[in-house]
């Protein structure tokens, strides 16, 4: 298909200015102003034969369809604010410019007297090698890519339940006299860079994205 490009295709430098700008915008790296982060890793610094030595054509990144803020290509680990525990995405000029809170408390308090029904934890997943695609097939996810002689890692921001039963009766705040309840992780599909044979391509893969409460009414037995 049009989104498939051989993994051996050279990362050419003769692209138009517009194409280069789009590629740069799509893969802008997260950098810290205090310069504590190292410089981008060069492909030649990687071990021979590693996945990072697979060269990906920049043309793959010219199409911006269906991009999710939960997928990040970066030479640096995504920053996590220690104070507010917020996760920052790429500072792009489009919908990627946003924050997602990483709820890490045992039972996070939103406002005084307000609690979450379920407890969730959000993390950046850096080494996802396989995933289920939208057709139900197991596919190989590219962890590292070589683009213009820089090594980028593909990160996924995933949210899942910390515990299926935050309280002994199930979900927090549910009337256990009338309802059975439990917390469960739900999923969505995001566009990720995968490989099949010698082809790199975009596929929709399933990742964890939320923790929700499932309830069912207790049926009374009248004998």
Curated annotation (Swiss-Prot):
Region (Disordered): 1-45
Disulphide bridges: 118-183, 161-211, 171-213
Principal place of residence: secreted
Glycosylated sites: 127
Keywords linked to the UniProt accession: Cleavage on pair of basic residues, Disulfide bond, Glycoprotein, Growth factor, Lipid-binding, Metalloenzyme inhibitor, Metalloprotease inhibitor, Protease inhibitor, Secreted, Toxin
GO molecular function term, any single one: nerve growth factor receptor binding
One term under GO cellular component: extracellular space
PROSITE patterns: NGF_1, NGF_2
Basic and acidic residues compositional bias, start-end: 22-34
Role according to the record: Nerve growth factor is important for the development and maintenance of the sympathetic and sensory nervous systems. It stimulates division and differentiation of sympathetic and embryonic sensory neurons as well as basal forebrain cholinergic neurons in the brain. Its relevance in the snake venom is not clear. However, it has been shown to inhibit metalloproteinase-dependent proteolysis of platelet glycoprotein Ib alpha, suggesting a metalloproteinase inhibition to prevent metalloprotease autodigestion and/or protection against prey proteases.
Annotated family: Belongs to the NGF-beta family.
Subunit structure: Homodimer; non-covalently linked.
Protein name, UniProt field: Venom nerve growth factor 1
Lineage, uppermost ranks: Eukaryota, Metazoa, Chordata, Craniata, Vertebrata
